[in-house]
């Protein structure tokens, strides 16, 4: 109540922000006449002037009015498009590092130009992130004319580009590309052999188009570069053959389970019942996969249990043409949010292989992670991040909490005239689809175009079949027609046109009422002026006809899990003040209604005694459905937040390793770091056999000599030293051993030459670090997938994960120090030629690895987000050795035992 009263008195925060920015727009408008009087050369000279003023210490913000006036005038001259006032407000929002919510058709592509140009002036680069390669190329070509006119360089990054092209694109002032490509280039750069092999420069400023799609819908799906691991295709096929023998059961209200397994559709998980467990054991025994007397739940057979669960999920929870399609002998995932296919992506936890076995396809080998990150952590690396979309306000809390981004709702240039009708709810899907066909007939009879949004490919093809039966001409747009997508959506506004689209396929292309005449002109070879004029006149007639009839009508065939995706579908109508309308048709058999809608909605409809073909239309029902959606959105947010909390642990470690790697690559001399590492390792080895503050009787001198020969390749007569000098105490002995090892190393360096040795040290450090980091990622995956079991021991899985991950990381760093020292002490470096040969071989190995590697934007299942499931790869994981500490562990914040006076973590506890 008080909040509403305060908002009424002082206006909402959003309204105050818009009011503040309108004052700046007034200043930009005052400059319009002055900048309009400049010649092209004078206008183009503004870029050099702005850069000079920045060099002299002027702030970007103080340049903003003049810069925006320059871009507006240049856009008017080059593209014939003048920025509206609200588009300038959108540009300011982006410059301030926030999200601009602008309705469909408000010209988001043009909005970005002013902010992009302003932030490109310092010369640190601006990344414009789009959802697909087509939009990246289109926008770079379209808006590139404006930027090039103003003297800016524009680049595009795409998959499959040679490194030289990519490097040039990243060196440009403005770089366009997809979220996947930017993310994978970041990972590849951190696997690079040298600084020269990297393609990206610093991550300065990114503007993310369709920011909700990239930062929210795809946030649960990590970017992974992986290499092939061991083949287990026969096991998948054998387990797949068992599934038809198992009977699906139900869980009664008393909690009793029938059948062999039960399904939880909310969490998309399966659970074996007691009888099912016994039946599976008998079947596995018959196939020779389980030995007599062994249990399916024993530690050795957990991977087998995982295979059974994956096969059951593949058969009963994942449907062909809904969750995936089979194309070219491969299972291709269909994005649940956009309806687009996602070639190259694979489900994790062995689920993808189980689906391949179900469909009788060749089973692709499981893989080992070489490098990974999430979009959440990648985009948080930018110094400044901004985004734009038509629908962000429903997710404003998540943008604020995870990315620190505020959402500003930009008012439309013209008031929205679209009418959003209440939902119509039917008892069955059959009745719902018949009602949709009737609605299509009625609306097209008025000469209005219709866009029908479906949630799956299966639904779009079923509707298409019904329309064919009714002899209604239509176009279908789903994941199977990527290439013709833009053309179909551009012509969806013609009078009487019927277009079926899965979710938001075709996003990024406007539906122009009357059709898009520019696309028709572009399809002709050298059209004459008369033809162009005729086509424009025909379009004007069609455009007016559709306007008079009431504009575009949107039909939603079911509600999505997110209100935002429903709003995106509605937003296709009523662009730029055009008339339009929308209505959703639902049934009690729809997924959202069946799984999440409250029982009272179903009971209410049945109590009303509804007859076949009748629908209920009431605001109460619509509100109840929206409440269900909010419940699902909250659940999905919790899952994304959980994933982020776990990935933050890995991200801290990733940051340390990548910073260390970059530091080593950028340096020509890491000898000081190597000396420190050697000293730590020698100290650690000596402590194993001569415990600190111990009596000589407790020393294992013979064991120490053997260990030094094994690890340091040096024979030291320590027993003889002790006989010759009875005053050789522990500290002096440690120093004498270290001096002898250093002297041996220096002698080796004199033979090879200092320059060759410096290069070799650098190569060895990077090679050891890369190998151990890959093993560490496998160990982290393994830990992550089993950590939820700690909950059964009344322990907090997240805290346990942090603790275990830190121990794994410490062990990895200790191992790295030992391995680097061991290799450097054992290898004899002879010449510069030998060094060049080692470098060449390592480069070739990295190239082979990258050629074999797969880039996966892996579809994380609900189980993964919750920390459930096991990947069935125990045999492939590099299990960390138990590290036995002979002395009290020094805390990271305690004084360093070396006596330097610094904290341990800032002294000997540091890698370098």
Swiss-Prot record:
Disulfide cysteine pairs (residue numbers): none
Enzyme class, spelled out: translocase
Gene: secA
Function: Part of the Sec protein translocase complex. Interacts with the SecYEG preprotein conducting channel. Has a central role in coupling the hydrolysis of ATP to the transfer of proteins into and across the cell membrane, serving both as a receptor for the preprotein-SecB complex and as an ATP-driven molecular motor driving the stepwise translocation of polypeptide chains across the membrane.
Compartments, record wording: Cell inner membrane; Cytoplasm
Region of interest called Disordered, as start-end residue ranges on this chain: 854-912
Annotated EC: 7.4.2.8
Cofactors, names only: Zn(2+)
Keyword Protein transport recorded: yes
Primary location class: membrane
PANTHER family in UniProt: CHLOROPLAST PROTEIN-TRANSPORTING ATPASE, SECA INNER MEMBRANE COMPONENT OF SEC PROTEIN SECRETION SYSTEM
One of the Pfam families matching this protein, by short name: SecA_SW
GO CC entries: cell envelope Sec protein transport complex; cytosol; plasma membrane
NCBIfam families, per database record: PRK12904.1 (NF009538), secA (TIGR00963)
Positions with a binding annotation for ATP: 87, 105-109, 510
Keywords: ATP-binding, Cell inner membrane, Cell membrane, Cytoplasm, Membrane, Metal-binding, Nucleotide-binding, Protein transport, Translocase, Translocation, Transport, Zinc
InterPro entries: Helicase_ATP-bd, Helicase_C-like, P-loop_NTPase, SEC_C_motif, SecA, SecA_CS, SecA_DEAD, SecA_motor_DEAD
HAMAP family documented for this protein: SecA
Cofactor note: May bind 1 zinc ion per subunit.
GO biological process annotation, one example: protein targeting
Reaction(s) the record says it catalyses: ATP + H2O + cellular proteinSide 1 = ADP + phosphate + cellular proteinSide 2
Recorded topology in the membrane: Peripheral membrane protein
Similarity remark: Belongs to the SecA family.
Protein name as it appears in the record: Protein translocase subunit SecA
GO function terms (MF aspect): ATP binding; metal ion binding; protein-exporting ATPase activity
Record's subunit section: Monomer and homodimer. Part of the essential Sec protein translocation apparatus which comprises SecA, SecYEG and auxiliary proteins SecDF-YajC and YidC.
Binding site for Zn(2+): 896, 898, 907-908
